[in-house]
A protein has these predicted regions:
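Long, contiguous binding/interaction regions
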Residues: 1-88
Length: 88
């Protein structure tokens, strides 16, 4: 089995959401075999900032679904979009 990199765009609920706190909480909700790689906060629209993250983990069945479910459970996150998926 190889490793997979998943690139997500997380959209906070409002422009007032603390994006740093959201990033800090990500590692705590991920499956055991997943880790937070790079992250970046980018202006999106109407004062909202998108959080772009890369999650690394083992390429196994159900991995992306588990990660996405965990990210959807984060406080102050409105949407989670998988933008890219690739083997490393």
């Amino acid at each position: 089995m190889g490793e997979v990199a998943l690139k997500y765009r997380l959209m906070p609920e409002s422009p007032d959401s603390d994006t740093s706190a959201i990033v800090d909480s990500i590692s705590g909700v991920l499956p055991e075999d997943a880790s937070l790689g790079a992250h970046e906060i980018k202006p999106f629209a109407f004062g909202l900032n998108a959080i772009i993250i890369v999650i690394m983990g083992i390429d196994r069945e159900g991995f992306a679904t588990e990660v996405e479910d965990a990210l959807n459970g984060l406080t102050n996150v409105q949407t989670v979009v998988l933008e890219e998926q690739s083997l490393v």
